[in-house]
Amino acid sequence: DNLELTSKYDLNVGKHRMNALVGYSYQYYTYERFYANNYNFPTDFYQWHNLGLGQALKDGKAGMGSDKNENTLIGFFARVSYAFDNKYNLLVSVRQEGSSKFGDNNKWGTFPSASLGWTISNEGFMEGITWLNNLKLRAGFGITGVIPNDPYMSLTRYNYGSSYYYDKGTWKPGLEVASNPNPDLKWEKSTEYNIGLDFSVLNDRLGGSVDIYRKKTTGLLFNYSVPTPPNLYSYTFANGGSVRNQGIEVAINAIPVQTKDFEWKTVVTVAHNASKLLSLSNDMYESNSYMDTGGLGEPISVSTHRMEEGRPLGEFYGLKSVGVSENGLFLIE
């Protein structure tokens, strides 16, 4: 279910243009699933339309399951933009969002953003430069948030596991703790600063943009190993580490050939990003300085990547093979 209400205001006076927007949004998500499997069918003719025909159901080996989850996201937002004389632009916005996925102490997050623009080519001192069609300088700032996929990671959850208890002559399955509560679970936030330049020349036959950015993500959502006791489960989902990304993006647009019946457009983009894992831990939750991820199947069966503090993300990490022995075994350096 979705609901969004907005109210807009516009004002134009001389060379001044301003518009404002305020709004409210409500989003309710529910997910339901049912699944079943069977095998050893006497024929494939029915496909999935006659699941009960398979022999596995008669043997008590067929599978079946179902689940359901739900979550709510509420937001209040406002945006104001101002422009003067087609030269100077200002945009300011803020969004306050609350999600049922977070802990009781931190369900709400505030996400502001702002940007400035200066269209230099519209200035009076640029009038004599006829080959320049557009030149604009931009700068911006913004904070964004990330919500966990699982809607119940801040709560104590229970599953029927491998533990049983004896009751009136019958062994019955017991409930086991499946997650520790975390009332302080909060938004993973990214703060980004950027500065950019747009340009076009020669009647817009050649143009492009250059953007330089720096982004820092804090409160990374992560499963931390915790002692039991005092915890009832060996992992707690919490906010911990931080990552930094910075780089440059360049785009060039060109129209080498342009006639009445034919136009050739070329777009070239170049980007460089440098990432660095600053930490995997914080004052409350500690982890190793690295974590192995990814993996290969047989016959290697090892991780392929390592996330390590002080190192870039996405690095391959593993054993280095230098050949194969006479017996067909891998030789490792």
Annotate each predicted stretch with a short phrase.
Residues R311-S325:
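C-terminal segments of large proteins
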Residues D1-R311:
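Extracellular/periplasmic, surface-exposed regions of secreted and cell-surface proteins
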Residues S325-E333:
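Short, intrinsically disordered, charge-balanced linker/junction segments flanking boundaries
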